[in-house]
Amino acid sequence: MGKVIGIDLGTTNSCVAVMDGKSAKVIENAEGMRTTPSIVAITDDGERLVGQPAKRQAVTNPERTFFAVKRLIGRRYDDPMVEKDKGLVPYKIVKASNGDAWVEADGKTYSPSQVSAFILQKMKETAEAHLGQKVDQAVITVPAYFNDAQRQATKDAGKIAGLEVLRIINEPTAAALAYGLDKAKTGTIAVYDLGGGTFDVSILEIGDGVFEVKSTNGDTFLGGEDFDMRLVNYLADEFQKEQGIDLRKDKLALQRLKEAAEKAKIELSSTTQTEINLPFITADQSGPKHLTMKLTRAKFEALVDDLVQKTIEPCRKALKDAGLTAGEISEVVLVGGMTRMPKVQEVVKQLFGKEPHKGVNPDEVVAIGAAIQAGVLQGDVKDVLLLDVTPLSLGIETLGGVFTRIIDRNTTIPTKKSQVFSTAEDNQNAVTIRVFQGEREMAADNKMLGQFDLMGIPPAPRGMPQIEVTFDIDANGIVNVSAKDKATGKEQQIRIQASGGLSDSEIDKMVKDAEANAAEDKKRREAVDAKNHADALVHSTEKALAEHGSKVDESERRSIEDALSDLREALKGDDAEAIKAKSNTLAQASMKLGEAMYKQAEAAGGAQQAGKDDVVDAEFTEVDDDKKKSA
C-alpha cells in the first residue's frame, strides 16, 4: 500500500503533509514554500497555473484568476452568500445547468470542485516529488460546519484530482489531533479556527489517545477574505473622496487593492503602522493617479471589529452545547492565519479567560492532523481514536407536520439510530418517509433532504404496523436513511446526495430561526400533539360506540355523540387549549361506555385489554446503537 497523504484544502492557502516515521512532516512545494496559495489561473494561451505562479500574475489577469473558490463549493447559484461573493471578486460566477454556482473564463465554465481539484493535483504532485512514488489516496479536511453537499463536492474534487479520499475530517478536529498526539495531555480543549474563508470552533476531550468532539459551531462565510475586503472598501472609499474615482469599477485596480490589503493586514500583526503605496493605480484626463496611505493597527482593528466579534457567539453556543463553562477549558488552540492578528488573540483571551496556546503553526497544523489521521487509517499510528460529531439534527416528518429528531446535533459519528413509527390511517398500505435536517419543531421550517416510499404494508388498523426508521451516518458525515416494516421485513433506503445538501446560510438561518421562534414552535408543537391525541380519541370512541353503544342508555349515548361532535368541530381550528378541553369532555362522557365494555368482557370470562385502538400516532420506541469506532 502506498503512502496516504493529508491535505488541508484551504480557502486562501493549502498544505500537504505525510507521516515520516512517528511524526507528520509538511512537504515543501516546487517553489520551496510550505503552503500553496489556493489560486488557479487560466492564461491567454489557455495554460493553467496553480499556486504561487497564479498569484503572481493575478494583477494583470484578474478575470481569469480564481481565488477563494472554496466558498462556492457545494453551493447553489441563488444562495445569498454567492450573491454577496459576486460583487467582491473580479472573475465571473455563473449559474450551471444543475443550478449550482460555477466560475467562467473565456467562455469556458468550471465547477468549484474542478478548480479545487486543480489545487489538489498540485498537492498530489508536491507529495509525489518528495516521496519519489505515486500517491493516490488522501485524507482531506473541511470546515466542521460544512454540510452534506459541500463534503460530497470536496470528495468529488479529490476524485477529479485522481485521489481516493479515504476520509473527510473536520479542520478543528485535525488541529486537535496534531496538538495532542505527542503530548501526554488530558483535558478539555477548545480549537478556535479562523481561516481565510471560514470560522469553526470545536470543543474536544482528550485523554489516552482518544480525541472526542463534544460540540462544534461556526460560520462558513467568515474569514480572512472578509477582513481583506473590509480594508479594500476603506481604501477605495478614501481614494474616491480624494480623487472622485471608484477603483472598485476597475478590475485590475481592484486586484491591486486586494493584494495591498492582504499585505497590510499581515504586516499589522507584527507592527503598529504600515504604508500602502500603489503608484499608477488609475488615471484620468489630468494624468496618472497614485494611492499612498498610512494605516495604523488601531484603525484596521476598528474597521474589522464587528467581524472579530462575530466569532464570539459560535464559541458560546459550542460551550453551551458541550455543557461547559469557559473556565472548564484547559487549553485554547489557535488555528488559521487570521489568529495571528493581536485583536483576535485578545478576544479569545477575554472569552476563555486564559492565554491561547501558540505552540502550533496555525497554517500547518490542520494538514499535520490530516496526515496523522492518514497514518491511523494506514495502521502506522496506533492507539488513536478520533470521535467527531454531526453539526445539525436529522429526523423525519410525522403526523401533523412535526419534525421528529432521530439524531440530535453534536451526536458522535459514525452513528446509527432507529425509532419505531406507525400508520395514521386504517388499512394504510404505504408510507412516505420525508427526511429533514435542522433545529425547528415543525418539519416545514427545516430543510428537506429527500423522501422515499415504503410500499406493501399489510392492511391493519391505524397504529398497529411497526415501521422502523434508521439513520446511519458514516465517519465522513454522509447520511443513509432506511425504513423497514417489521412484520414483512420489507425495506427501502435513501442516500442523501449532494443536491440535497444545505447552504451555510440555510444552516445559520435554521439555528437563528430556532432561537428566535422557540416559543412559537413550542405552541405549534403543542397544538399538533393535542390534535393527534384528539384524533386518536375520536377514532377509538367512534369504534367503541358502534360496537357497544347499545349497552348504555340513550341519554349517555347522546352526550357521547354531542362531545364527539364538539371535538370534531374544535379539530377544525388550531386552538390547543380548546382541543384539550373538548378531549377531556369526551373522555369523561365515554367513561360509562368503557364500564359497559369492561363488564361485558368480564361476563365473557376473559378480561381483554380495553382501548387497544387508543394509539397516539407517531409514538415510538428508541433504539440507540451509537457506534464509536476509529474515525
From Swiss-Prot:
Q: What induces it?
A: By stress conditions e.g. heat shock.
Annotated stretches, region: Disordered: 602-631
Which GO MF terms are attached to this record?
A: ATP binding; ATP-dependent protein folding chaperone; unfolded protein binding
Q: Known HAMAP family for this protein?
A: DnaK
Name the gene for this chain.
Answer: dnaK
* Annotated SUPFAM superfamilies: Actin-like ATPase domain, Heat shock protein 70kD (HSP70), C-terminal subdomain, Heat shock protein 70kD (HSP70), peptide-binding domain
Q: What does this protein do?
A: Acts as a chaperone.
PTM sites of type Phosphothreonine: T198
The entry's protein name is: Chaperone protein DnaK
Record InterPro entries: ATPase_NBD, Chaperone_DnaK, Heat_shock_70_CS, HSP70_C_sf, HSP70_peptide-bd_sf, Hsp_70_fam
What keywords tag this UniProt record?
ATP-binding, Chaperone, Nucleotide-binding, Phosphoprotein, Stress response
UniProt similarity note: Belongs to the heat shock protein 70 family.
